[in-house]
């Protein structure tokens, strides 16, 4: 599992992720130059002793070349200096609209204005939050401020020897493109002679895997699960609009912010491709929806977002005062006379990849069978994700990794007798966990189709950020976080990486 930006340490029983990779054809390898901060690394980037090193193995599979065109939304950068910003055509520099009200952006900009560049010497590392396959994440404080960040530190030498420089570059370039309330903010990135660092948003609530373990029965209520998956769905919709296939959705990668809302993390396995957003009339969309689901997908049957009505929660059915049958009939007749609004569909359906990447319990059948895959793998993992939140386990887990893979391909979906969940929840999971991707819910219309499913009835998509989260994390006591003593940086990073195992299954 890749590194976390949250506060909790990494449990030993977390699921295993796989991807042994070869360079993808459309990317250039990253060259690294020596910079003036090289002499400061040993004294600045030091690690405190920690017991959070991961003992479970991340299983890596053979990754073949991807056959999709790369999006020009974010072009790969061949420069490698200590610059905090790089080239990203959509959102670069100060063009991200949500920077304005963030005090952390102001603090970062103040340091840049004063010193010209931002580097390791401007941060105080407080403690290690977790470690992953390509780096270690630390809680860091910007000197002279009360601004805290999650800093991901990657040993470039170790990445090069393990042929993972491309993954680190891919993650950085994707993070530079993102500007969404449920996706991470990359405040800065810089490099030293030995290390590549990403300065990101810190999520004190840990991840959904850890939070689920604390729930009664180690599972979420259906209402809580609906809250989390709705926010994840909006994040996935945004990623697909940018031509980014996530490929690593699981509770461990969904972090909880201080306000209880969530944030997706870890994009080193993501695939970038071309996408062509299309505006389609709802009448066409509804007819397609009826073919793929037993539910009515007519716009009149689907609750549309509204910024006018303000329910106390965005995740509860709305109740209206009773009206006479005559009034209801007149309303229906009026509604039938109004043409439904067109809908935006931005699903990268043409993307194809032969990469064998992901976590065993979340791998889609088409990945395991080596048939090539596209954006539909994200909707398969979405179904596994919802299943795990509701039932406390994944549906195809076997006695071992090989058995799990065989179950994904050959075993039918089964629901446990307990806990009892709604028919709509089961139907959504069943529609997503279809082994043939072309018959899977959201295969053509993506999140647009998902939002219309009855499981999300009562969700006001325009006001999701106004909803009350199921749980608010306890405030973090930053004062009690011990400062890191001097230690050998390279030794600590190599120590973390030695905890990862690589296996070949095929």
Curated annotation (Swiss-Prot):
Residues 77-92, 480-492 have a biased composition (Low complexity). Its main location: membrane. ATP binds at residues 129-137, 152. Residues 12-23, 55-67 have a biased composition (Basic and acidic residues). InterPro entries: Kinase-like_dom_sf (IPR011009), Prot_kinase_dom (IPR000719), Ser/Thr_kinase_AS (IPR008271). The active site is at 248 (proton acceptor). Gene3D superfamilies: Phosphorylase Kinase, domain 1 (3.30.200.20), Transferase(Phosphotransferase) domain 1 (1.10.510.10). It is found in: Cell membrane. GO terms for cellular component: plasma membrane. GO terms for molecular function: ATP binding; kinase activity; protein kinase activity; protein serine kinase activity; protein serine/threonine kinase activity. Residues 1-96, 475-495 are annotated as: Disordered. Its EC number is 2.7.11.1. Residues 24-54 have a biased composition (Polar residues). It comes from the Eukaryota. Disruption phenotype: No visible phenotype under normal growth conditions, but the quadruple d6pk, d6pkl1, d6pkl2 and d6pkl3 mutants are deficient in lateral root formation and mildly agravitropic, have fused or single cotyledons and narrow and twisted leaves, form few axillary shoots, are almost infertile and impaired in phototropic hypocotyl bending when exposed to lateral white light. It holds the Pfam family Pkinase. This is Serine/threonine-protein kinase D6PKL1. It comes from Arabidopsis thaliana. The lineage of its organism: Eukaryota, Viridiplantae, Streptophyta, Embryophyta, Tracheophyta. The gene is D6PKL1.
């Amino acid at each position: 599992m890749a590194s976390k930006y949250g506060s909790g340490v990494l449990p030993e029983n977390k699921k295993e992720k796989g991807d042994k990779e070869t360079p993808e054809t459309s990317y250039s390898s990253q060259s690294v130059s020596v910079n003036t901060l090289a002499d400061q690394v040993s004294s600045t980037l030091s690690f405190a002793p920690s017991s959070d090193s991961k003992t479970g193995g991340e299983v890596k599979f053979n990754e073949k070349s991807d056959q999709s065109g790369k999006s020009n939304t974010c072009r790969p950068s061949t420069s490698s200096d200590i610059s905090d910003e790089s080239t990203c055509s959509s959102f670069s520099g100060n063009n991200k609209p949500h920077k304005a009200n963030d005090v952390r952006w102001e603090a970062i900009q103040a340091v840049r204005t004063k010193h010209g560049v931002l580097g390791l010497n401007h941060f105080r590392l407080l403690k290690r939050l977790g470690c992953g396959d390509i780096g270690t994440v630390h809680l860091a404080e910007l000197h002279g401020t009360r601004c805290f960040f999650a800093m991901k530190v990657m040993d470039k030498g170790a990445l090069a020897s393990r042929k993972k420089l491309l993954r680190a570059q891919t993650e950085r370039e994707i993070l530079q493109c993102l500007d969404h309330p449920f996706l991470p903010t990359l405040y800065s990135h810089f490099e030293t002679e030995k290390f590549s660092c990403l300065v990101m948003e810190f999520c004190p609530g840990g991840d959904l895997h850890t939070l689920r373990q604390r729930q009664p029965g180690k599972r979420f209520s259906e209402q809580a699960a609906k809250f989390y998956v709705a926010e994840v769905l909006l994040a996935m919709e945004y990623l697909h609009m940018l031509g980014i296939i996530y490929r690593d959705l699981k509770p461990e990668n969904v972090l909880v912010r201080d306000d209880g809302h969530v944030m997706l993390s870890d994009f080193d396995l993501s695939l970038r491709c071309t996408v062509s957003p299309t505006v389609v009339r709802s009448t066409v969309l509804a007819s397609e929806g009826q073919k793929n689901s037993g539910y009515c997908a007519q716009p009149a049957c689907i609750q549309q977002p509204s910024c006018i009505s303000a329910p106390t929660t965005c995740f509860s059915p709305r109740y209206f005062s009773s009206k006479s049958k005559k009034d209801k009939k007149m309303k229906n007749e009026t509604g039938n006379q109004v043409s439904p609004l067109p809908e935006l569909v931005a699903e990268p359906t043409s993307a194809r990849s032969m990469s064998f990447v992901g976590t065993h319990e979340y791998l889609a059948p088409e990945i395991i069978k080596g048939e090539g895959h596209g954006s539909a793998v994200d909707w398969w993992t979405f179904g596994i994700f919802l299943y795990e939140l509701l039932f406390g386990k994944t549906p195809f887990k076997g006695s071992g990794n090989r058995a799990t893979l065989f179950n994904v391909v050959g075993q039918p979906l089964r629901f446990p007798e307990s806990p009892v969940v709604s028919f709509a929840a089961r139907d959504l999971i069943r529609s997503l966990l279809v082994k043939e991707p072309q018959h899977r819910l959201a295969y053509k219309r993506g999140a647009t189709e998902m939002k219309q499913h009855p499981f999300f009835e009562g969700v006001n998509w325009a006001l999701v950020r106004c909803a009350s989260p199921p749980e608010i994390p306890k405030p973090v006591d930053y004062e009690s976080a011990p400062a890191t003593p001097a230690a050998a940086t390279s030794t600590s990073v190599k120590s973390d990486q030695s905890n990862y195992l690589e296996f070949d299954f095929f």
